[in-house]
Amino acid sequence: MAAKFLLTILVTFAAVASLGMADSVLLSGQTLYAGHSLTSGSYTLTIQNNCNLVKYQHGRQIWASDTDGQGSQCRLTLRSDGNLIIYDDNNMVVWGSDCWGNNGTYALVLQQDGLFVIYGPVLWPLGLNGCRSLNGEITVAKDSTEPQHEDIKMVINN
């Protein structure tokens, strides 16, 4: 079981490295600080100084976490349990994906199609169809063939 998980992680990171995706990936335990961004093609995901997480396409805002004004000098962190969190400068949670599981290796990827996806091990038992965020439902997709209608996806390894 552990060998299968390790192989999955190695394949995931080899793919990320070979595609030159360093600017579009945030790994578990890493932080994106206020004013910094992930970029993929025409899309940019920025954590702003006012704590708003915003996705842009060609410089035009197309999605936001609606957390502006809820703190200052915020940062976006992908925790080792898979939970994506915006913290303010007092380490208070401003926004979170509220999806987490066992500690593991996860990767937030801003894809070429503009979706930002969290890849990693299974976070919940079968039958649970989604996780709540602080501002709405996060669509969970088991694989890349399922319909994608939201901006955030949780992709799990079977």
Curated annotation (Swiss-Prot):
MF annotations from Gene Ontology: carbohydrate binding
Known glycosylation sites: N103
Any one GO BP annotation for this protein: response to other organism
Intrachain disulfide bonds: C51-C74
Residue intervals of the Bulb-type lectin domain: 23-131
InterPro entries in the record: Bulb-type_lectin_dom, Bulb-type_lectin_dom_sf
Signal peptide location: 1-22
Record carries keyword Disulfide bond: yes
Function: Taste-modifying protein; sweet-tasting. After curculin, water elicits a sweet taste, and sour substances induce a stronger sense of sweetness.
Oligomeric form and interacting partners: Heterodimer with curculin-1; Disulfide-linked.
UniProt name for this protein: Curculin-2
Organism: Molineria latifolia
